[in-house]
């Protein structure tokens, strides 16, 4: 076995590889950028080498620096993780040229599967079913439009070198094709350095099912069953499971065999994933092959009991596959939820900032957390905003869903937006619970998933106020004078009456406590609520409320209190005299940047007339392109940025004047 390997990646996947390497007695070398100098993968590795500035193009995508780091440290092999250089044939070739083992497939296999158009031609020869479409080399815009017209709408424009949901556009009308093509090519060029695209018929209500395959240098191939990755936002997976529920067994077997045929067709070695787009009747079409380990590989590990990173290392070292096909079986059901720093209610835009509080669920044989993030870490604009992957196992799908709901209820994040509450609602959603799965599930259920009730139970408001009251009492046990009155958000009067003032969602909340026996009577919104409480620690309130004893998790900051209950979080701000509740969205006449990024297109100038939904400019953030659109028919008063400019979240991009209604 290897004595030392270098991991050419960061975050949770680097930590994941290090964990298995340690188990096998293999020394590890991490690489890091400026932003990652104190990252967990750097601390976990035996050695760490600095490779450049924070932008990935100046660090994690620098092939020469990574190769040199491996040579300088004596690493015999490089594990690429996923993303970054994991599917880069030039990187694999550089490893080969420097006598370093690339822990992945041969260069020829990466080349064959790296471009969607090329891979589809190979799969057609191998008898693997394909979605109807155009996969050729002619990239003339008018020609591609004609192909789309011939295929029939809706169609998908897909970057030939794409992946991860990037470089993809759904086009439903012929007149929208050329603008969508330009946007797709721009994103593909920025993300992959290759603007070639292919056109495919869009399958209505498709499922996204993938098969995990492995090959070795001895000509052996196996599959480790399938994963359903249908639940997606922005064409990116967010909740995955294994095995795929409610699929006919004969259809699954056909997919599994097609996946092995695909791997064999390119003499594949190592871990690979063959992805299929699946119609509701179970008919499957080859979509692409990912020549690397997938983000969602843990669900396969949970149902098979296999360590796929260990398989990768053994196969790369020249050993045969650890198991033959007849030795692999499915045990139970597993789910993976990707916990992101993002704002689901704002179109899932990434959230940037510091994680002020982080509590992971307790891990066990049934609950696993893969992460490279700890409390105090920054989520930056440079990399993917994933906080962690939460993976659960149950004896069946129903048990796994229950386990996931419970684990999400123990997963607490504060300091920046996150999708935990969204994930919990997703798990509880009837469509998901009943396995009515397709890639449009989130959009179809957005009323339930993205627009939770703004109402909040009085008991939670009173509990938040009680935490503030008890915190001040703990800090000031026997006050000699009413110093608490100096606080703008609460006060104590001479009749043992305590008033706490909070704010939630712009609404002022006033809660008055009067002492009674061992607890308080809280007056709020016309209700009288008896409550007793004790701070168990800095993040737990033990309380007796409405005759029930319970514990409530919370976090506090200088700005306010966040309560965590049943997968949901409830944020309360301290009410201050100088509180200024500014609209984050700007006014209709002032369009602002939803997040930090780079302006990639400016399509309007001052005095231009535009129609509602016209794209005014595009903003790229984390390699995803966002369109800034006109909210109404109107005139551009001013455009404040040019192509290539960096913008911050909240920067005013365009001053927009709606057209006055025409008088008849």
Where are the language model's segments positioned?
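N-terminal beta-alpha lobe that positions the nucleotide/phosphoryl donor
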Residues: 1-274, 278-294
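Short acidic-glycine loop/turn motifs at beta-strand connectors
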Residues: 173, 215-220, 279-282, 362, ...
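Catalytic cores of soluble metabolic enzymes centered on carboxylation/carboxyl-transfer
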Residues: 259, 298-528, 649-655, 661-664
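Conserved nucleotide-binding/hydrolysis modules and their immediate coupling elements
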Residues: 307, 516-519, 525-540, 544-550, ...
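Catalytic P-loop NTP-binding/switch module of NTPases
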Residues: 555, 559-593
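Structured functional modules or segments
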Residues: 581-664
């Amino acid at each position: 076995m290897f004595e030392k390997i270098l991991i050419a990646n960061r975050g949770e996947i680097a930590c994941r590889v290090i964990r298995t390497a340690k188990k096998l007695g293999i020394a590890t070398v991490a690489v890091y950028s400026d932003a990652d100098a104190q990252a967990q993968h750097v601390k976990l590795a035996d050695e760490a080498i600095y490779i450049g500035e924070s932008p990935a193009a100046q660090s994690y995508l620098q092939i020469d620096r990574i190769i040199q780091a491996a040579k300088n440290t004596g690493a015999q092999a490089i594990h690429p993780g996923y993303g970054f250089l994991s599917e880069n044939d030039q990187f694999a070739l550089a490893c080969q040229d420097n006598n370093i083992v690339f822990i992945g497939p041969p260069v020829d296999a990466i080349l064959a599967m790296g471009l969607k158009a090329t891979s589809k031609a190979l799969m057609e020869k191998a008898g693997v079913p394909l979605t109807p479409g155009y996969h050729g080399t002619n990239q003339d815009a008018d020609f591609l439009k004609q192909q789309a017209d011939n295929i029939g709408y809706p169609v998908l424009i897909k970057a030939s070198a794409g992946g991860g949901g990037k470089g993809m556009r759904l086009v439903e009308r012929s007149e929208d094709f050329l603008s969508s093509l330009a946007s797709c090519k721009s994103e593909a060029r920025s993300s992959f350095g290759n603007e070639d695209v292919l056109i495919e018929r869009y399958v209505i209500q498709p499922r996204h099912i993938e098969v995990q395959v492995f090959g070795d240098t001895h000509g052996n191939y196996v599959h480790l069953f399938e994963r359903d990755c249908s639940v997606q936002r922005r064409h990116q997976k967010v909740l995955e499971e294994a095995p795929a529920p409610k699929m006919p067994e004969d259809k699954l077997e056909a997919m599994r065999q097609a996946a092995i045929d695909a791997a064999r067709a390119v003499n594949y070695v190592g871990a690979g994933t063959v992805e299929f787009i699946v119609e509701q009747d179970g008919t499957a079409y080859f979509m692409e092959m990912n020549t690397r380990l997938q983000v969602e590989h843990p669900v396969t590990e949970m149902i098979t009991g296999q360590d796929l990173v260990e398989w990768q290392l053994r196969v790369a070292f020249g050993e045969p596959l650890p198991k033959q096909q007849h030795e692999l079986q499915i045990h139970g059901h597993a789910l993976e939820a990707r916990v992101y720093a993002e704002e689901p209610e704002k179109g899932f835009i990434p959230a940037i900032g510091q994680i002020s509080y982080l509590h992971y669920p307790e891990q066990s044989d049934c609950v696993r957390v893969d992460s490279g993030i700890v409390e105090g870490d920054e989520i930056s604009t440079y990399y993917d905003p994933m906080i962690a992957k939460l993976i659960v196992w149950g004896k069946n799908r129903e048990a796994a869903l229950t386990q996931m709901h419970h684990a999400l209820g123990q997963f607490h994040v504060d300091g920046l937006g996150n999708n935990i509450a969204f994930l919990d609602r997703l798990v509880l959603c009837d469509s998901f619970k009943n396995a009515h799965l397709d890639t449009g599930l989130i959009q179809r259920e957005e009323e339930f998933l993205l627009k939770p009730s703004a109402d909040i139970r009085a008991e939670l408001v009173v509990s938040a106020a009680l935490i503030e009251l008890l915190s001040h009492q703990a800090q000031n046990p026997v006050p000699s004078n009413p110093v608490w009155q100096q606080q703008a958000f609460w006060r104590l009067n001479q009749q043992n009456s305590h008033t706490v003032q909070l704010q939630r969602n712009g609404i002022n909340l006033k809660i008055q406590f009067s002492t009674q026996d061992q607890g308080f009577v809280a007056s709020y919104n016309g209700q009288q609520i008896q409550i007793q409480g004790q701070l168990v620690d800095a993040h737990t309130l033990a309380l007796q409320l409405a005759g029930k004893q319970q514990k409530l998790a919370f976090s506090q900051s200088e700005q306010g209190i966040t309560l965590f209950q049943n997968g949901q979080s409830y944020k309360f701000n301290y009410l201050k005299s100088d509180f200024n509740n500014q609209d984050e969205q700007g006014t209709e006449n002032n369009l602002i940047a939803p997040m930090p990024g780079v302006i990639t297109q400016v399509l309007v100038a001052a005095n231009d007339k535009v129609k509602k939904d016209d794209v005014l400019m595009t903003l790229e953030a984390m390699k995803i392109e966002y369109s800034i659109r006109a909210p109404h028919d109107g005139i551009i008063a001013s455009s404040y940025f040019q192509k290539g400019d960096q913008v911050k979240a909240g920067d005013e991009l365009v001053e927009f004047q709606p057209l006055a209604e025409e008088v008849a």
